[in-house]
Every structure is written in structure tokens, then in C-alpha cells.
Amino acid sequence: MKRISSDEVKKVAELARLELNENEIHQHAEQLEKILEYIKQLEKINTENIACTTRAIEVVNVLRKDERRDYENSDELLDLAPSRENKFFKVPKIINE
């Protein structure tokens, strides 16, 4: 199996915005090699007669109908907020223009 180079680990770390020292780069290279070896083992499994699925168990949502309800004590809730403006919560800006 082809070994994963330090440069490849550095590139992946850069893309993931991770700062790794040389020891961590070596550790991650070994871990990635083990993961790829495991994937190679999985590729050998015959799945020809296995039906495609997206999950192991079926997921069913039990939903209720959306109903608009006025809350009579909205001022009481707004008073709990660190900051408010009229009838709205005031939150810090998180998106730069």
C-alpha cells in the first residue's frame, strides 16, 4: 500500500484549517493509512445481493400540524434576554458584509 506522505497530511490539515506539529503529522499519517487499509478490506466484501439503503433502520417522523399560537407573556421572555429591541431579541452580528 502507498504510504501517505507528510506533504499530503499537511495539505489536508491546511484545508481543514488545522495547525499540526511534526509529531502530529506523523500520527495522522499513520491513522489515515489504517483507515485506508480498513476501507480496502471493506471493498473486498461481496455486496452484490444486498439492497441499497441509506440507514440501518427506517426513520419515521411523527409530526403534528403547525399551529400559530400567540404567547401572552412575550415581554416576560424578552426581559430574560441580554439585549432586546422593541419586541425582538437583539443578537450580535455574526456575518461580515
Swiss-Prot record:
Function: Allows the formation of correctly charged Asn-tRNA(Asn) or Gln-tRNA(Gln) through the transamidation of misacylated Asp-tRNA(Asn) or Glu-tRNA(Gln) in organisms which lack either or both of asparaginyl-tRNA or glutaminyl-tRNA synthetases. The reaction takes place in the presence of glutamine and ATP through an activated phospho-Asp-tRNA(Asn) or phospho-Glu-tRNA(Gln).
Name of one Pfam family that matches: GatC
BP GO annotations: glutaminyl-tRNAGln biosynthesis via transamidation; regulation of translational fidelity; translation
Gene Ontology molecular function, alphabetical: asparaginyl-tRNA synthase (glutamine-hydrolyzing) activity; ATP binding; glutaminyl-tRNA synthase (glutamine-hydrolyzing) activity
Alphabetical list of InterPro entries matching this protein: Asp/Glu-ADT_sf_sub_c (IPR036113), GatC (IPR003837)
EC number(s) given by UniProt: 6.3.5.-
Catalytic activity, as annotated: L-glutamyl-tRNA(Gln) + L-glutamine + ATP + H2O = L-glutaminyl-tRNA(Gln) + L-glutamate + ADP + phosphate + H(+); L-aspartyl-tRNA(Asn) + L-glutamine + ATP + H2O = L-asparaginyl-tRNA(Asn) + L-glutamate + ADP + phosphate + 2 H(+)
Subunit note: Heterotrimer of A, B and C subunits.
S-S pairs: none
Protein's recorded name: Aspartyl/glutamyl-tRNA(Asn/Gln) amidotransferase subunit C
Keyword Transcription carried by entry: no
